[in-house]
Design a protein with these regions (language model features):
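Preference for long, well-ordered alpha-helical segments
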Residues: 78-104
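Short inter-helical turns and helix N-cap capping residues of alpha-solenoid HEAT/ARM repeat scaffolds
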Residues: 26-27, 58-60, 90-91
Length: 118
């Protein structure tokens, strides 16, 4: 885990891509932590990988949830279509995380947080 946080602190595209390689781990807990750290980094370089994790129905729900939240934390509105699509996911943990991410994106853009209707 030290390596994960060390890479986070570098905040470079290279560090971001190195973290994304960690999604090949068998550990769902590690994959969850990587998604969390990528959200903290707020680096759009991670978005393609985070979108893949969210959209992969075989991925652990904990990882999909954290990928959605990280996508919102990054603040790039290009992820709105994926988040909208998965806000209707049958798993409430995933669907609700997508709604939270969409609300965060709306808030960052200056919209009213309470009235956002996705």
């Amino acid at each position: 885990m030290r390596a994960v946080f060390s890479l986070r602190n570098q905040r470079s595209n290279e560090a971001c891509l190195a973290l994304c390689k960690g999604f090949s781990s068998e550990s769902a807990l590690l994959r969850h932590e990587i998604a969390y750290v990528l959200g903290q980094m707020q680096n759009p370089t991670a978005l393609p990988t985070l979108i893949q994790r969210l959209e992969d129905n075989t991925e652990h729900v904990m990882v999909r949830h954290e990928a959605a939240e990280a996508m919102g934390a990054i603040g790039d509105r290009s992820v709105i279509p994926s988040l909208k699509r998965f806000s209707k996911d049958p798993l409430p943990e995933v669907a609700e995380s997508c709604v939270v991410a969409l609300d965060l994106l709306a808030w960052v853009a200056g919209s009213e947080f309470e009235t956002t209707d996705w």
